[in-house]
Amino acid sequence: MQAIILAAGMGRRLGEYTRDNTKCMLPVNGVRLIDRVLGQLSQLGLSRVVIVVGYKGQNLIDYIGHRYDDRLKIEYVNNPVYDKTNNIYSLSLAKDKLQEDDTLLIESDLIFDDSLFRMILDNPYPNLALVDKYETWMDGTMVRIDEDNNIVNFIPKKAFKYKDVDSYYKTVNIYKFSREFSQNKYVPFLDAYSKALGNNEYYEQVLRVITLLDNAELKALPITNGAKWYEIDDVQDLDIAETLFADKSKLMQRYNMRFGGHWRFPKLLDFCYLVNPYFPTMHMKDELRANFDILLSEYPSGMYVNSLIAAKYFDIRQKYTVVGNGAAELIKSLMERVEGRIGVVYPTFQEYPNRKEQTEIIGFTPDNDDLTYTADDLIRFYADKQLSTLLLINPDNPSGNFIPKADVLRLAAWCKERGIFFVVDESFVDFSEDFRNNSLLHNEILQAYPNLAVMKSISKSYGVPGLRLGILASSDEELINWTKHDVSIWNINSFAEFYMQIFGKYQKDYDRACQKFIAERERFMARLTDIPFLRVIPSQANYFLCQITEKYTSEELTRRLLMDFNILIKDCDNKDGLENKNYVRIAVRDQKDNDTLVEALKTL
């Protein structure tokens, strides 16, 4: 068995990263792709490795030098017209060598787990294309396969249809060809195809023709063990690859620095970010899809219309309402406006205190392991602190502590009497029991307490974090008007605007989704409490704060779940008030996902 690596391409899409070297010289987490693959190949007992070079080929040859002489016999084939041809020509230059032995054919811009080579070599079938079920990040040649893993056809990029993706597999660009297959099938068709259509084509096109034969002799080998691989064509691919293949000591850091965008990692089960799994309904999503074209091509409305739509959304007055590009935009604006001392309950959602000087923050940390507190606790603590502003997140993040509405109104009255500006973030309130009666977003409440500002994210309970929506509501019209002028006139997009426009039709569905969520949270908590090393704190939000009581630190458990099960939870060890106390936060998802997490925890 030999290996042929195609490494002649210029890698133009990688820009400055390939200005002086070909793609396989690209370092991923400090290790060049060529070193990684040669290290993997050196474990296989191959007769030789043939590398087809072209662009900056001498740099590659000089870099490899004699470093692998004790493990691999390396030969080179040069493609002098790499800038005018495609990989079909590179392979045709190596066709004589291809026919001399059974061959692993590999493209040089891949990074993958060691297990993939063993998987394809250990399979007894002589001619295989390694494939993986289509995921949204994949680009390039696809195949369809039958129940016996015969390749029914190859689908080039120009024939790709999104409506057919459920039947697609992506070629990983690792192939195993027997010597006989290369001699009798592949090379004869390679010669004919190149002669007929030229050298600016792809070698997969030859395989596409071969699969049309009655006895093609080529099968697919789907990846079934969850092994990782990635094809690096541009700088974003490089960033994702460095996350997927990060060293275990840096893995959490790589995910945490992203602050979302986890659709790029389809196998990741995200228990870190907080979203209602039961809303929007499929019918609402269908309506959004049906209007995709017009929403994509039309400008959104400005602040006047969007504050009107948001006010309708929550049945409050337009003049009391300002819309934000997520609550985060409004938090920034609000925190920059408030002056003086601000009372903050710790641990908390850091976006608020991060916007203030530490000297301005008067922190209150509950003196109990469950981090519970009441309105009376806050009144007692802050009675002599000369606050200008009091912040309450209710339910709180990350503790899930909830203060009943009547007590929140008592706090509002207490603040009003003392001239304290009272900010209530109720982004998670619709996850609380009796949620229909817990919100402060009512005209009469806002009118009665002009010192009150209510912040609400339209991401969490509404299940649409990608739309980036939030509101700030207050009868302090000076505050609302100031905020409207502080943010951009076009601060939300057409999709977010349309979502708010149609939400009223789905209000009953939303209520049912919240009720279903509350039932699942109760069931999930019962299952989590069976894990012997977890102490689960009751919650009225869509997450549980859990203390790890034995076996692991919070960092160790978080890393184990990510490395062994592709499950991401939140390590709270760096949160103010939770340092070195071994807390993690676990989101509540749907029953299937929640049970997956529980079963993973049981194995640890």
Residue spans for each PLM region:
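Conserved N-terminal catalytic core of the sugar/cofactor nucleotidyltransferase
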Residues: M1-I5, V31-T103
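Active-site pre-lysine segment of PLP-dependent enzymes
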Residues: M119-N123, T372-K385, P398-S461
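PLP-dependent aminotransferase class I/II
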Residues: Y169-T171, P280-T281, G302, N451-I537
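N-terminal "arm"/small-domain region of PLP-dependent enzymes with the aminotransferase-like
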Residues: I240-E298, K385
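PLP-dependent aminotransferase-like
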Residues: E336-L392
